[in-house]
Each structure stands twice: as structure tokens, then as C-alpha cells.
Regions:
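Alpha-helical adaptor scaffolds
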Residues: 274-308, 312-329
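Amphipathic alpha-helical scaffolding segments comprising HEAT/armadillo-like alpha-solenoid repeats
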Residues: 292-296, 324-337, 356-365
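Structural detector for internal amphipathic alpha-helices that build alpha-solenoid repeat scaffolds
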Residues: 311-324, 345-357, 373-381
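Short coil turns that connect the paired helices of HEAT/ARM alpha-solenoid repeats
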Residues: 225, 303-306, 335-343, 363-373, ...
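Iron-sulfur cluster-binding cysteine motifs and their immediate structural context
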Residues: 28, 198-221, 238-267, 332
Length: 381
């Protein structure tokens, strides 16, 4: 007979702790349990921000708030949600070469694959006991940060990330939705930010418009993923970022303290650890073919699986960090100022003009996207 055959015989406290211990032993740094009830607070926030246009076409959990805030959408018989946090805290290594683009920490390695495997260990135990279990990680089906908050793992920082007491926000989160009757957290963690506003003050585009509220229209992490023309107002602020932006976490006191305690030493030579993926060659992005780029960066979110958006980002970076006297920079911009794709050509035009390489600009042009870029050049700073 399995435990699920007679739920009334289960010692909920003992069984819950066994599952949490299994999660910790499987590599999770933090694990807790929340109710499978509708996440009303998150649903209201998603709907309000969507109606205000703060999502800027972003889909993910915004696509269907009624689904992403209801664990029973994933499992109709759900009673509990186990949520786990896996740390990816690692200090940023020095830039290896001058034409290198920065990558956010959470994609230095496939942390979500590690997270899923840990969550699957919990799910397997539940299933062997006769219960149902659905693993959700990096999934639009659930607002995992809100579940983690309800489970008592941490509080919402002013940068909207979940902050775990004594550890900060460098964590990926995932859930196991189950029909097992478990002991849920009795109350959330109290706010630990106090009067601190470092994340608000240090956001390069002032995208944190109020404590816990992000305007995706300004957020570099989203603008780097969003297809189309990269907003001119934020190109200079992009700096050398190719994918993601960690600025609001890099200044967060609990995150910084935890990183210093747990990370490998930043000035050790990068060998085969995750830090080897912290920087990407701009030259590689602009010269590699589609197949090679998707093979190397296919785990990233790339709109329509089109590496063009990586190249677009790389061209903006080239305009920000390139040297007009560098032969390679000139050759790359010359190549893309004559590229067949208008989106890429327009961003190369911006980069060339920013570096004062006006002789590379197209003499004749009939595409409206590029023409709009050329008309905007006097405002480029």
C-alpha cells in the first residue's frame, strides 16, 4: 500500500520534512512549501502592470495571468507546491579581451537543468508514494517568485527579485506541484530591505519605477531579448551587455555579502568553471553562422530562434566599446553597414556614427528602417 492510499495516516510534519531534506540533499540551497491556492496578489500585479503597458510586449507569465497564478492549472488536484532555490552566485571575472560582451550570471551555465534534476528527485519520491507531481522550472505556467514568497523562502526586494535572508537573489527558482497534503509555511518572511534603495538608484535606465515595480520598456534585460529595433534611448546605457543585466543585484547588500562568502575568488584564472561563460567575443557573434550561434547559445531565450537579435545586440555593444582606430572594428562595421538585413544594417549605421566612422555609412539607402536611423544620427551622442 502507498501513502496516497490512506492520506489520513500520514504524519504531515514528518513527511514534509523528509521531502524538504530530499530537496536539500539533491542540491537545492533552499526549499519550502506553499499552498496550491490561487496567487491572488501576483495575479493582481500582473494584470495591473499589463494594463499600464509596463510589460512592453513581454509574454512569459504575463501571457495568461489566470494560468500562471493558479497551480491547479498545472495539476487540477493540487494541494501543495514545493518550491526550491538553486544558487548561481559567482563573482564576475575580469574582461578577457577588449571586444568582449558581458553575460548575466544566470546563463553562465544551465542552472535550470540542475534545478530540474533536483526537483525531479522530489517528484519521483512523491510519485513512488502514490501522489501526483508536476515539475515547473523556467516555465511560464507559474509565478515561481510568488510561490517562493508564500513558502517563506524570502521577501521581495525593491528590484522585484526574491531575496533570501542571508543569501540575496542569485538563485533560480522552480516548483513541484503536487496533490500530497503537506505542511505549508504559516507566514511569509518580513521585508528586509528597510530604507535601502541601492537597486533603484543604480539601475542604468531607471527601469525600477517604484519599489518592486519594473518598467519593461526601460529594462535592459528585456530589451536585449525583445525583437525589433533596439530602443535608441537606451543604447548607450547598454554598455557591453549582450544578454541580461545584473546591475540591480550587484549592488544589493545581502546578495553582495553572500557572493563574497561563497564565490570562487574573482581574480583566479578562469578555467573550466561557470565563469568561463561570463564574457563572449563580439567578433564571434558577428562572424559566426546561425547554426554555430544556436549551438552555443541555444539555451538562451532568443526570439524566434533567430541569432539576428544577438548580432543586433553585438552591434550596439561595438558602438559603445569599439575603437575607431581598431582595424577589426572598422571591418566588422563595414561588413554590417552593407548587410542584407535592414535591422542589422541600421544598428551598424548607429555604431559607425557613434565611433565617428561616417565614411562607412551607406551612400544610397531605400529601406525605411535604415533611413530612420540615418535621420536620427544628429541626435546620437
Amino acid at each position: 500500500m502507498q501513502l496516497a492510499d490512506d492520506p489520513s495516516s500520514i504524519d504531515k510534519n514528518k513527511y514534509t520534512e523528509q521531502l524538504l531534506a530530499l530537496g536539500r540533499n539533491s542540491g537545492l540551497h533552499q526549499v519550502g512549501v506553499a499552498s496550491a491556492e490561487v496567487l491572488h496578489r501576483a495575479r493582481q500585479a500582473l494584470n495591473e502592470r499589463k494594463s499600464q503597458g509596463l510589460h512592453n510586449q513581454m509574454q512569459f507569465t504575463y501571457r495568461n495571468p489566470n494560468r500562471s497564478t493558479d497551480p491547479t492549472a498545472a495539476l487540477p488536484s493540487a494541494k501543495s507546491v514545493i518550491v526550491g532555490a538553486l544558487s548561481y552566485s559567482t563573482q564576475m571575472p575580469e574582461q578577457p579581451e577588449k571586444l568582449s560582451a558581458r553575460v548575466a550570471r544566470y546563463v553562465w551555465s544551465d542552472y535550470y537543468a540542475q534545478l530540474r534534476e533536483s526537483l525531479r528527485q522530489i517528484a519521483k519520491q512523491l510519485e513512488s508514494d502514490g501522489f501526483r507531481a508536476v515539475v515547473l522550472a523556467d516555465d511560464n505556467a507559474i509565478v515561481d517568485r510568488e510561490v517562493a514568497y508564500q513558502a517563506g523562502l524570502g521577501w521581495f526586494g525593491k528590484n522585484s527579485n526574491l531575496l533570501i535572508a542571508g543569501a540575496g537573489s542569485y538563485f533560480v527558482l522552480g516548483c513541484v506541484v503536487t496533490n500530497a497534503p503537506l505542511v505549508v509555511a504559516d507566514k511569509p518572511v518580513e521585508d528586509g530591505c528597510g530604507s535601502c534603495r541601492r537597486c533603484l538608484d543604480n539601475c542604468p535606465t531607471q527601469a525600477i519605477i517604484a519599489p518592486g515595480v519594473i518598467d519593461a520598456n526601460k529594462c535592459l534585460a528585456w530589451l536585449l531579448q525583445k525583437p525589433g529595433v533596439f530602443d535608441r534611448d537606451f543604447r548607450v546605457a547598454l554598455g557591453d551587455r549582450l544578454y541580461g543585466c545584473d546591475d540591480c543585484q550587484e549592488v544589493c547588500p545581502p546578495t553582495v555579502r553572500f557572493e563574497k562568502r561563497t564565490s570562487v575568488i574573482a581574480d583566479e584564472p578562469v578555467k573550466h568553471d561557470d565563469r568561463a561563460n561570463a564574457w563572449v567575443s563580439v567578433q564571434k557573434i558577428l562572424l559566426a553562422d546561425d547554426e554555430s550561434l544556436l549551438k552555443e547559445f541555444g539555451a538562451w531565450y532568443i526570439a524566434n530562434r533567430d541569432p539576428k537579435w544577438l548580432r543586433r545586440n553585438a552591434l550596439v555593444i561595438l558602438g559603445n566599446i569599439g575603437d575607431a582606430n581598431d582595424k577589426l572594428v572598422v571591418e566588422l562595421l563595414q561588413k554590417y553597414c552593407n548587410h542584407g538585413d535592414a535591422i542589422l544594417r541600421s544598428h551598424a549605421v548607429w555604431a559607425a556614427a557613434r565611433l565617428g566612422l561616417n565614411h562607412l555609412l551607406p551612400v544610397s539607402e531605400d529601406d525605411e528602417i535604415v533611413l530612420a536611423e540615418l535621420r536620427a544620427l544628429p541626435s546620437v551622442k
